[in-house]
Amino acid sequence: MGNMDGKTVEELSATEIHRWYKKFMTECPSGQLTQHEFKQFFGLKNLSPASNQYIEQMFDTFDFNKDGYMDFMEYVAALSLVLKGKVEQKLRWYFKLYDVDGNGCIDRGELLNIIKAIRAINRCNDEMTAEEFTDMVFDKIDINGDGELSLEEFIEGVQKDELLLEVLTRSLDLKHIVYMIQNDGKRMEISERPRQEITTGNSLP
């Protein structure tokens, strides 16, 4: 799973791990979650091609050993990253999620498609359109103007821009997924969704 994921897993309590293990084995008695089961658990049906690609990309980034399954430790690492991951850890994961073709760079098309897919799944109605958000990201952090973002450009640029970090974190808030895991697959109503503390990844009161 790598050092990044190990650090977040170590921060989990035994109670949390036990609860997640019970839930995981209830939903997936075989101990290995397939991509199809991953979609099924979250009630993701009739997805657009872009949304379907996003979910498959998310699954692949959490399938750390690339065997086509998510086992319990990968499941824990994924959830701990969402709940307790530090900003840089989350940004590295976001980058992997955006880099659909795996070439080590994010282009405008990749970012735009992922943002559209996330908003469709999260049922977001942000004031800023996906196109405007994508333009803002590239205008602010594509330092060399080549139309692609390297990992270094992405992490350094986002961390230096408080507004961009806030918008990015809000756009990629995955706490609704954790809510569904903890509440037997029920979707979180928009009014229930927690505001995120940008610097720590925790919810604000």
From Swiss-Prot:
Transmembrane segments: none annotated. The lineage of its organism: Eukaryota, Metazoa, Chordata, Craniata, Vertebrata. CDD domains: EFh (cd00051). The gene is GUCA1A. Ca(2+) 2 binds at D99, D101, N103, C105, E110. A lipid is attached at G2 (N-myristoyl glycine). GO terms for molecular function: calcium ion binding; calcium sensitive guanylate cyclase activator activity. Keywords: Calcium, Lipoprotein, Metal-binding, Myristate, Repeat, Sensory transduction, Vision. One of its GO terms (cellular component) is photoreceptor inner segment. This is Guanylyl cyclase-activating protein 1. The keyword Lyase does not apply. Retina.
